[in-house]
UniProtKB/Swiss-Prot annotation:
Keywords: ATP-binding, Ligase, Nucleotide-binding, Purine biosynthesis
Family (UniProt): Belongs to the SAICAR synthetase family.
Protein name: Phosphoribosylaminoimidazole-succinocarboxamide synthase
Catalytic activity: 5-amino-1-(5-phospho-D-ribosyl)imidazole-4-carboxylate + L-aspartate + ATP = (2S)-2-[5-amino-1-(5-phospho-beta-D-ribosyl)imidazole-4-carboxamido]succinate + ADP + phosphate + 2 H(+)
Coiled coil: none
Gene giving rise to this polypeptide: purC
Enzyme Commission code(s) on record: 6.3.2.6
Length: 297
């Protein structure tokens, strides 16, 4: 018989995930259907979102050549029935206080930075780049993880060296870019561009660097269609940029610079977001989401 969720002690809540303690070495990481945008957790939820994030992470944890924090399969008997398919048993790590971002294309905050300074996170770039320009080689741009509700802070590589040492900083940079390139090459073969993504790493009890949290989910990555890709224009996305775009549109009536929280999402935006997440999972993994374990929406 599987344990109940209340058999485990709740440790922490994030924007999307809940963390529970299983034992001294293992945690239960549960992905909810919550969605965040512009540092707000929205009132609306996206049906099946937590299961899709978990399915995508499981696929890429097994695909990329990097040790990770998984400590059991997605049907591990330690996972309670009520969260099956949206929860993973993971090793407890000493998490590093930064996100490791790989950028293959100029977009988002990187584009704004470039337009203002000619650089992205302090890295000089050639003139004449525009929205969705592809970099000659992907950029590594670390960021300090902010507390819930605040913005992450981009930091220079030299600052990262001061924080973790030159050996660990080089290891984080090299592993981030290696993982990104491996996954981006696979995604291109399925008609998907991974424009950018972010990773988190932690250290285990033996001092090993492990990939942790989530990887290549539509929450942590920008996904574009190869067929629709055009330099100089905003791309069609298969990620939560779809939600961000609606929130800043006149249709939402929300003023980002104002004091009010974002409005609830209309039903058509909720369903379209779910379909985007499902589509990118199925195209990249080659599997049907209908076959993923756990109770669906």
């Amino acid at each position: 018989m599987r344990p109940a969720l209340f058999d485990y002690r709740h440790l922490a809540s994030g924007k999307v995930r809940e963390i529970y303690r299983i034992d001294d070495e293992h945690l239960l990481m549960v992905a909810s259907d919550r969605i965040s945008a512009f540092d707000y957790v929205l009132d609306s939820t996206i049906p099946d979102k937590g299961r899709i994030l978990t399915a995508m992470s499981v696929f890429f944890f097994s695909f990329v050549d990097a040790p990770n924090h998984l400590a059991g399969p997605p049907d591990d008997p330690r996972i309670p029935e009520e969260v099956l398919g949206r929860a993973l048993v993971v090793r407890q790590l000493d998490m590093l206080p930064m996100e490791c971002v790989a950028r293959g294309y100029l977009t988002g905050s990187g584009l704004l930075d470039y337009q203002a300074t000619g650089k992205v996170c302090g890295i000089p770039l050639p003139p004449g780049l525009v929205e969705a320009s592809r970099f000659a080689a992907p950029l590594f741009t670390p960021a300090m993880k902010a507390v819930l509700g605040e913005h992450d802070e981009n930091i220079s590589f030299s600052r990262m060296i001061e924080m973790v040492g030159v050996v660990r900083a080089n290891q984080l940079r090299d592993r981030t870019l290696q993982i990104y390139l491996q996954a981006a090459d696979h995604a291109l073969k399925t008609g998907i561009i991974i424009a950018d993504t972010k990773f988190e790493f932690g250290i285990d009890r033996d001092g090993n660097l492990l990939l942790a949290d989530e990887i290549f989910t539509p929450d942590s990555s920008r996904y574009w269609s190869v067929d629709d890709y055009r330099v100089g224009v905003v791309q069609r996305s298969f990620d939560k940029q779809f939600v961000r775009n609606w929130l800043v549109s006149p249709e939402s009536g929300w003023v980002r610079a104002g004091a009010l929280s974002p409005p609830s999402l209309p039903d058509d935006i909720i369903e379209a977001t779910r379909l985007c997440y499902v589509e990118v999972y199925e195209r990249i993994s080659g599997m049907s989401f209908d076959d993923w374990i756990g109770p669906g929406a």
